[in-house]
């Protein structure tokens, strides 16, 4: 099953990009033997619309247009469910075992994700009730994908 990290906004070269890329590379190495051939990072520019609602609507169109047929959509949003790393890992394994061709994790831009995306997503996952910059959420998502691979593989990286 392909894993796609879909990000509104582009990260400039720097430590944030390097760290997220490092976790993606680790997830790729750990995931191949588990039926996750690679984590693909897709970025697109934030909308330039003046109103937040218009920006979110334009970004939602781009997100929905980029989904592969049959792909499962997970929205990362502060309103979502709080899940443990083990629960997230189990969800990835179950989704793979059900035969989904791809799983897309969507990270919104500065305004967050539109209601349309939140309605289309199942599940909506939160990294906490605080608001984080999308560059940091990208790192956190990449790390959680790597952590999920290690949990599925029985690797000691994750400790309860």
Swiss-Prot record:
InterPro entries: Alpha/beta_knot_MTases, RlmH-like, tRNA_m1G_MTases_N. Belongs to the RNA methyltransferase RlmH family. Its EC number is 2.1.1.177. It catalyses: pseudouridine(1915) in 23S rRNA + S-adenosyl-L-methionine = N(3)-methylpseudouridine(1915) in 23S rRNA + S-adenosyl-L-homocysteine + H(+). Its main location: cytoplasm. S-adenosyl-L-methionine binds at residues 76, 108, 127-132. NCBIfam families: PRK00103.2-3. GO terms for cellular component: cytoplasm. One of its GO terms (molecular function) is rRNA (pseudouridine-N3-)-methyltransferase activity. Specifically methylates the pseudouridine at position 1915 (m3Psi1915) in 23S rRNA. SUPFAM superfamilies: alpha/beta knot. Homodimer. The keyword S-adenosyl-L-methionine applies. It comes from the Bacteria. It is found in: Cytoplasm. It is an enzyme of class 2 (transferase). This is Ribosomal RNA large subunit methyltransferase H. Keywords: Cytoplasm, Methyltransferase, rRNA processing, S-adenosyl-L-methionine, Transferase.
């Amino acid at each position: 099953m392909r894993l796609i990290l879909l990000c509104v906004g582009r990260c400039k070269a720097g430590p944030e990009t390097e760290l997220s890329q490092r976790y993606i590379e680790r997830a790729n190495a750990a995931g191949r033997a588990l039926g996750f051939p690679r984590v693909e990072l897709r970025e697109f520019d934030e909308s330039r619309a003046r109103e937040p609602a218009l920006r979110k609507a334009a970004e939602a169109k781009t997100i929905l247009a980029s989904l592969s047929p049959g792909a499962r959509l997970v929205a990362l949003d502060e309103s979502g469910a709080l899940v443990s790393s083990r629960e997230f890992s189990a969800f990835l394994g179950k989704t793979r075992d059900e035969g989904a061709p791809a799983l897309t994790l969507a990270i919104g831009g500065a305004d967050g994700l539109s209601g349309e995306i939140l309605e289309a997503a199942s599940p909506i996952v939160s990294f906490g009730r605080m608001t984080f910059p999308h560059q940091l959420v990208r790192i956190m998502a990449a790390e959680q994908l790597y952590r999920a691979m290690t949990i599925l593989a029985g690797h000691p990286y994750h400790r309860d």
